[in-house]
């Protein structure tokens, strides 16, 4: 095909126009042939020269390659011109020996220049992380010499285009080429604005490259503008700019043509041809990860925005749509950053091993390098990058470190530092990961600081034995109880508040620390006396005291109103589970709008206050007193006469529009004469306060619910027994010894349970979890590592079950009943004496959960600046990852609501209670920090009163459903993802 183009050169001037038409026609035919070859997966590149016109045809990749190599085109044009001149001269005169010798020298120097240029292209491509040659932007490098540095050139030889070197210099460079290398400090992105020589683009090429951009990214690069006089240099420069775009993607997982195609999508030709400097700068900021912007962990919402150029859309709808569709791929990003961190980690370990002359795997003591920067440091890191763990770097810094890996060197001036601490590091830092290493270190430092504080506190009291420091009292009375000698800008707090840097600073100045106690009597006051002075602080009143007082007040209101409904003069405790189980016969009217009837323990401060303000309107309606008689004290139950229950007009729904007739409740007086009659009227609901509660109550059937949950519990128990038998290699089911699984979780555990569902007795689960377990039964598997212990437990349980049963008295006083409970999700159950052991375990688990919940509440209150326990919004913390970070959790135990934690995990949490710390990284809506509400759009969010007490704090209402232990659930369990 090249011969066809060359054969068109020797033509006469009068035949120029006709020959041009012939050439155009033949080039179109050649283009068609290239398309057919492309269908057979053959790649073709063709350069044709006719007079001053240059034609580039071929397949897509062939054209792209030729257009990126300006030197190929120049060399071919130059070769054709020289050949034509040589042919003319050969016919006119004979070349002399000197001329022949000069010709040989010219060929030799041209060959050497070509060799040097190819080697420069290879080195430049290697610096970009590519295995192919990449054209060197000589003009840009000479204009901006700090962007790319060339090392290894012979002494006295400056870097420039090989055309400017003489024969001796070229030979010298080739002799020393092994030491030549390119170091890219800043990639080139801005396209050139100057046009070079004139190159004519014909209609054949226009038809070959569609302006619509539908032929793919490579075609867009060679698309001409409306001016047919676009130069050869401009076309080549445009392609070279695009080839340099992926400078920071050389470590990407994907490679090959798809990588360049993605980059080509980012730089449409219309911007480069128009010479738009600003648009190119916009692309530079959006398409590259600039090292200065080293966000270690870019959020997913940030990256997709950067993939869309900020300039107005160009006239290429196909490409524009393509760019908008591109979204952040977290999996690809995660795989990429993980791979880069692994490479940098291996690089650091290899360099560190070389520095200490060790063989085999080594562990770098990063804390030592940070605490002894003069004696232990690293040289050769890129400018602006400190030496840290690779897990703290982002992608740009990781790539820059890998580019400079040959220069990196560990400098160890004092080897004794490594030897003296190596044993401590191995003892205190588990090798299972960064998190365990950090946990061990901060735990040790906090314990040291706590011991230091206890010792100094005891010295201030005149004692020689260490005493526990009452940190809350120091915070409550900063003028009378304070600490001197702490490092600058470090307040006195519990050690659990401090991070590693502050803990180390406190230990360094431990000798200067002094506790000042001006009023020792404050340390002996009771809790109520201590909290009294705090009522004048901005918090105004302790939240825990306040909500407890309100709940007690609402409880008294409910008890009094319930007694009035029964015609009694004394307050009677309300059996809340019975009211929920029988909403048609037992309900409450007059509650504030939107507040259902529940135990006061379910309500937060805002709803409790609304109930207290509207207490005069509250009225209990009891249509079937016999339902509640068994829950009344014996003396009270005998005073209620239930004869009025036989009225035929009674069973009307409270929601009907007709009036509900009165029922008479006869109450015997003290002298058992003159009975009193109190009329209880149930008018139609008008304020809609119980609207959200009544429909749910009418739909709820306790009998159906009880039958369903009993059946599900039996199925799950049978499933567990079958899986337990399979684990022992038996065909029959084996009763599961749950106590053994709870006592030895390392040797006996269950795999395959649904996420968020712990292994417990089926009787402790609600309907949602039971159904999830049954749906997941194929994956459930029992792991029994000690069969002999298991068999012993089975035999003991079998022998105990065969013992003669004790005589059970039918009297209700013999059985242990769960009376006095208030929560809606607890029903009254009767537990035989034989199950006392199981009850004690359930009670123990419940106590552990309460202790862990109290611990989390106290720590969360400290984190938001309250200084008192605040209910932890577990669900909001779960659905807003990264907003609240919990430090100090034991290794292997993740932060969850206590109802989702195993007994062993809760015990470990309580053991590490002093080290657990909540940190609010990014507040979520509804969170109160230092009396400031983050977002008041929450329906039950915190309320700040402005009328009576402008500084009194409202804490979000605790309306969330809690799971309870034992056989004590009446309502459907909440979503276990909470």
Swiss-Prot record:
Residues 284-297 have a biased composition (Acidic residues). A motif (Nuclear localization signal) lies at residues 299-306. One of its GO terms (cellular component) is nucleus. The modification Phosphothreonine is found at residues 535, 537. InterPro entries: GTF2I, GTF2I-like_rpt_sf, TF_II-I. The modification N-acetylalanine is found at residue 2. The modification Phosphotyrosine is found at residues 248, 377, 482. Its main location: cytoplasm. Transiently phosphorylated on tyrosine residues by BTK in response to B-cell receptor stimulation. Phosphorylation on Tyr-248 and Tyr-377, and perhaps, on Tyr-482 contributes to BTK-mediated transcriptional activation. Sumoylated. It is found in: Cytoplasm; Nucleus. Residues 669-690 have a biased composition (Polar residues). GTF2I-like repeats lie at residues 103-197, 331-425, 436-530, 541-635, 703-797, 839-933. There is a cross-link at residues 221, 971 (Glycyl lysine isopeptide (Lys-Gly) (interchain with G-Cter in SUMO1)). One of its GO terms (biological process) is transcription by RNA polymerase II. Homodimer (Potential). Interacts with SRF and PHOX1. Binds a pyrimidine-rich initiator (Inr) and a recognition site (E-box) for upstream stimulatory factor 1 (USF1). Associates with the PH domain of Bruton's tyrosine kinase (BTK). May be a component of a BHC histone deacetylase complex that contains HDAC1, HDAC2, HMG20B/BRAF35, KDM1A, RCOR1/CoREST, PHF21A/BHC80, ZMYM2, ZNF217, ZMYM3, GSE1 and GTF2I. Interacts with ARID3A. Interacts with isoform beta of PRKG1. Belongs to the TFII-I family. This is General transcription factor II-I. It comes from Bos taurus.
């Amino acid at each position: 095909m090249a011969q066809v183009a060359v054969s068109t050169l020797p033509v006469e001037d009068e035949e120029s126009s006709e020959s041009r038409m012939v050439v155009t026609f033949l080039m179109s035919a050649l283009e068609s042939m290239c398309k057919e070859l492309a269908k057979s997966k053959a790649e073709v590149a063709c350069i044709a020269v006719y007079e001053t016109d240059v034609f580039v045809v071929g397949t897509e990749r062939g054209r792209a390659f030729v257009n990126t190599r300006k030197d190929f085109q120049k060399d071919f044009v130059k070769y054709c011109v020289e050949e034509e001149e040589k042919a003319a001269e050969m016919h006119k005169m004979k070349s002399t020996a000197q001329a022949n010798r000069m010709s040989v020298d010219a060929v030799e120097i041209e060959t050497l220049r070509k060799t040097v240029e190819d080697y420069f292209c290879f080195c430049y491509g290697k610096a970009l992380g590519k295995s192919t040659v990449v054209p060197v932007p000589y003009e840009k490098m000479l204009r901006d010499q700090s962007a790319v540095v060339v090392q290894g050139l012979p002494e006295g030889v400056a870097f420039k285009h090989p055309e400017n070197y003489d024969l001796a210099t070229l030979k010298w460079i080739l002799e020393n080429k092994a030491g030549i290398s390119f170091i890219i400090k800043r990639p080139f992105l801005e396209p050139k604005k100057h046009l070079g020589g004139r190159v004519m683009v014909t209609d054949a090429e226009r038809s070959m490259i569609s302006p619509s951009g539908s032929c793919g990214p490579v075609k867009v690069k060679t698309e001409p503008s409306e001016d047919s006089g676009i130069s050869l240099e401009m076309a080549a420069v445009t392609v070279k700019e695009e080839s340099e775009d992926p400078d920071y993607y050389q470590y990407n997982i994907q490679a090959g043509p798809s990588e360049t195609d993605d980059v080509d999508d980012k730089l449409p030709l219309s911007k480069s041809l128009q010479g738009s400097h600003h648009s190119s700068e916009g692309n530079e900021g959006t398409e590259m990860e600039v090292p200065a912007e080293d966000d270690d962990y870019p959020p997913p919402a940030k990256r997709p925005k950067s993939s869309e150029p900020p300039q107005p859309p160009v006239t290429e709808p196909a490409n524009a749509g393509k760019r908008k569709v591109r979204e952040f791929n977290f999996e690809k990003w995660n795989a990429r950053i993980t791979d880069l961190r692994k490479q940098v980690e291996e690089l650091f370990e290899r360099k560190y091993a070389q520095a200490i002359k060790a063989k085999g795997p080594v562990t770098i003591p990063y804390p030592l390098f940070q605490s002894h920067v003069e004696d232990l440091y690293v040289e050769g890191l890129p400018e602006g990058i400190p030496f840290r763990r690779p897990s703290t770097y982002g992608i740009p810094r990781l790539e820059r470190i890998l580019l400079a890996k040959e220069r990196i060197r560990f400098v160890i001036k004092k080897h004794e530092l490594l030897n003296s601490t190596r044993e401590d590091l191995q003892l205190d830092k588990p090798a299972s990961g960064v998190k365990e290493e950090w946990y061990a270190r901060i735990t040790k430092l906090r314990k040291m600081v706590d011991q230091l504080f206890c010792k100094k506190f005891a010295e201030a009291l005149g004692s020689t034995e260490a005493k526990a420091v009452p940190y809350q009292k120091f915070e409550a009375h900063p003028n009378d109880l304070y600490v001197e000698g702490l490092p600058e800008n470090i307040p006195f707090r519990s050690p659990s508040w401090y991070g590693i840097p502050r803990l180390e600073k406190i230990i360094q100045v431990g000798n200067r620390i002094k506790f000042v106690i001006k009023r020792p009597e404050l340390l002996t006051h009771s809790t109520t006396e201590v909290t009294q002075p705090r009522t004048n602080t901005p918090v105004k009143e302790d939240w825990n005291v306040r909500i407890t007082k309100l709940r007690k007040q609402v409880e008294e209101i409910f008890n009094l109103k319930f007694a009035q409904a029964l015609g009694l003069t004394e307050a009677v405790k309300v059996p809340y589970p019975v009211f929920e189980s029988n909403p048609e016969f037992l309900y409450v009217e007059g509650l504030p709008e939107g507040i259902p009837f529940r135990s006061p323990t379910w309500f937060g401060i805002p709803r409790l206050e609304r109930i207290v303000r509207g207490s005069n309107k509250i009225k209990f309606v009891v249509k079937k007193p016999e339902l509640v008689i068994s829950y009344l004290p014996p003396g009270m139950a005998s005073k209620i006469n239930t004869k009025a229950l036989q009225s035929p007009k009674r069973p009307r729904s409270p929601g009907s529009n007709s009036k509900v007739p009165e029922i008479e409740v006869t109450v015997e007086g003290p002298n058992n004469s003159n009975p009193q009659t109190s009329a209880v009227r149930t008018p139609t609901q008008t304020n809609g306060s119980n609207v959200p509660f009544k429909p749910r109550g009418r739909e709820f059937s306790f009998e159906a619910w009880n039958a369903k949950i009993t059946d599900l519990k039996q199925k799950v128990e049978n499933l567990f027994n079958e899986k337990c038998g399979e684990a022992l290699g038996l065909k029959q089911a084996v009763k599961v010894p749950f106590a053994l699984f709870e006592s030895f979780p390392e040797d006996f555990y269950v795999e395959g349970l649904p996420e968020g569902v712990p292994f417990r007795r089926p009787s402790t689960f609600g309907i949602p979890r039971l159904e999830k377990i049954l749906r997941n039964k194929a994956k459930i598997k029992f792991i029994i590592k000690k069969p002999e212990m298991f068999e012993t437990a089975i035999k003991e349980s079998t022998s105990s079950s065969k013992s003669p049963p004790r005589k059970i008295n039918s009297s209700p006083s013999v059985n242990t009943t769960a009376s006095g409970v208030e929560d809606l999700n607890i029903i009254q159950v009767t537990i035989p004496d034989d199950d006392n052991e199981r009850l004690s375990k359930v009670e123990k688990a419940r106590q552990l959960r309460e202790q862990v919940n109290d611990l989390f509440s106290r720590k969360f209150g400290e984190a938001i600046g309250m200084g008192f326990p605040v209910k932890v919004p577990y669900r909001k913390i779960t659905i807003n990852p990264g907003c609240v970070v919990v430090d100090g959790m034991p290794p292997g135990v993740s932060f969850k609501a206590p109802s989702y934690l195993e007994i062993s995990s809760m015990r470990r949490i309580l053991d590490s209670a002093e080290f657990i710390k909540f940190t609010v990284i990014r507040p979520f809506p509804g969170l109160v920090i230092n009396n400031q509400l983050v977002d008041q759009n929450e329906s039950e969010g915190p309320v700040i009163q402005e009328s009576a007490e402008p500084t009194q704090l409202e804490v979000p209402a605790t309306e969330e459903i809690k799971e309870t232990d034992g056989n004590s659930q009446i309502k459907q369990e909440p979503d276990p993802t909470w």
